[in-house]
């Protein structure tokens, strides 16, 4: 199986996740997003500063690093970096939904984006492990 298409899809999804998380973080920090502070009732946050920084640095940063690794980094780390970024996105959305509830469809959509990142990373790893070896046969996986 050719992994080029999977790699391209993974880069696109990672870049989308990175850019949208970073833009969302900036929007929260500078007040462009019209989200009332009452949304934070019952959370440990008095304002959106800490959530915005976490969103931009941790969620957006991990997706950006995963995209950069997939584009320019060592191929052996691209699936791992993307899966980690996807897990961070899924975890972020799960915690957000648990803390403030499922208020808008965007929360569910980004949860799915995280799952897509994980799925594409797994597919890329599978494709790489099933490329024909020197003998023309797929690499064998041994349990022992």
PLM features: residue spans?
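Topology signature of small-to-medium multi-pass alpha-helical membrane proteins
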Residues: 1-144
